[in-house]
Amino acid sequence: MTSRRRILVVTLDTLAERMAGPAIRAFEIARALGAEHDVHLLTFGGCSREGDGFVARATDVQSFRGEVESADVVVLQGYLMATFDWLQESEATIVVDLYDPFHLESLEVERFKPAPERHAALARALTELSAQVARGDLFLCASEKQRDLWIGHLAAAGRVNPDTYDADTSLRSLITVVPFGLDSTAPRQVEHGIKGVVDGIDADDPVILWGGGVYNWFDPLTVIRAVDELRSDVPDVRMYFLGMKHPNPDVPEMAMAVRTRELSDELGLTGRHVFFNEDWVPYERRADYLLDADIGVSAHFDHVETAFSFRTRILDYL
């Protein structure tokens, strides 16, 4: 029988009715662990929602150390280890969630900024990863391909060594795969989110859904051009972007989001064949939108971020 432990799951992302990928992953990890342990989900962002089988709340710099000192296990993601260097000496078991390869992500996030800013952003990411790799007791990732990436990183940092190898030649006890997963309950539509609700989209129109945010590493422009070509054969085709404004106010609008709107306007598609939902859809209401779609689409550029990322929103299409 598993003994109950006090577990902290820590994120920097906003915990609210509307959540992005990192917050959703932290929320679902906390929910899964809450079935057998005393779990507190902490965020340094805003928190306006309750947990489900666990406590969800905001924390701050002054309170965080005391929270960690009272925990048996800390599961963390994002830029935390380098900021709170005392975590290196913590007696808690530190589990580092590496599902977001943010050092590769930074190459795209900062792509259109001056070179010194880009180099500084990458250096900050690598400093954080170095702190995480030096201290983590267990590392999580979201796919076998990601695991290959991180084994290389761990090996270069000396974490794949005679001790860790002899303890487990598969290295699964050092780094393991925790996929994002699918909801165990079937989606149910309470009310229509798109068809017959959005002005310009009728109840019988075929809908193409872009189910996540619009970031620099995505290629919505190709999809919009395809809609432009398709409309002559399918005049009632509609494309719907599920959320343009990130729920975390610290995440700025990216250049690709601006270019997407501009192209749609230039082709005369906006409000006729292409529609933008400005605000993020509430997490619990996403089925209302997904079940109104006939096609789910995502497009990416052929670069290293695409190769090693894990597109959390696409699982909802299934």
Give the residues covered by each predicted segment:
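N-terminal subdomain of nucleotide-sugar transferases
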Residues: 1-47, 69, 229-232
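Short acidic alpha-helix that forms the nucleotide-activated donor recognition element
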Residues: 65-69, 134, 257, 281-294
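Conserved donor-binding/catalytic core segment of Leloir-type glycosyltransferases
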Residues: 8-11, 140, 182-186, 193-218, ...
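Acceptor-binding helix/loop patch of EC 2.4 sugar-transfer enzymes
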Residues: 12, 16, 96-127, 147-153, ...
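Nucleotide-sugar-dependent
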Residues: 20-21, 218, 279-288, 294-318
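N-terminal strand-loop element at the rim of the active site
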Residues: 12-17, 32-65, 160-168, 247
